[in-house]
Amino acid sequence: KDGQLWGHPLYDWDYLKKTRYNFWIKRLKWNNEIFDILRIDHFRAFDTYWSVPYGSKTAREGKWIEGPSYHFLDSVYKQLPELNMIVEELRPEVHELRDHYHLLGMKVMQFSFGENERKVKYKIPKQSVVYTGTHDNAPLKQWYDELEDKEFIKEVMISLGYKGEDVIQDILSYAFDCDALIAMLPVQDLLGYGKEARVNLPGTVGSYN
């Protein structure tokens, strides 16, 4: 209820703009030389980001600030036209920004089984990377084991043409069968591991992370 207070200093976007975002450009350029594709987490912060005053005890004391948005990304692609990015855009506010640059979005299946899937056929868009879960999620088996409404997930998978006898295997199969350009599956999901294989528990410090 208090949000996540990370304690990170904010970027001085006014100064970075004067330098043609050189700080970012150099880092993106280097990473682009050693990796085929980059994943940008918290992409929404280029649109708006949550600013918390120094010394705050919780994140509730912050406010939304406009990010550099199109000006920043125009500069990035002018200087690095070959840059390939996957962007974490789990909120609808940044879909227009993502689509303007034809970027691959992230579709995390654990987050995408909601009320809407009761009304329309479940579908992963082509211009995306599908994940069963990320490093912040529980392994797929743990997630499914702890669900209250397992029958709903089973119904969704049956509607997609699967038998529904092994729902976890159906979800894994759909990740590879769907229209997404890339499927990204954690190894613990492929091996069928549960709670014992979780690698991170957000907002905590301990053996998980």
Where is each model-derived feature located?
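Alpha-amylase-like alpha-glycosidases and glucanotransferases acting on alpha-linked glucans and related
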Residues: 1-184, 188-190, 194-195
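Low-complexity, glycine/alanine/valine/leucine- and proline-rich hydrophobic stretches
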Residues: 191-209
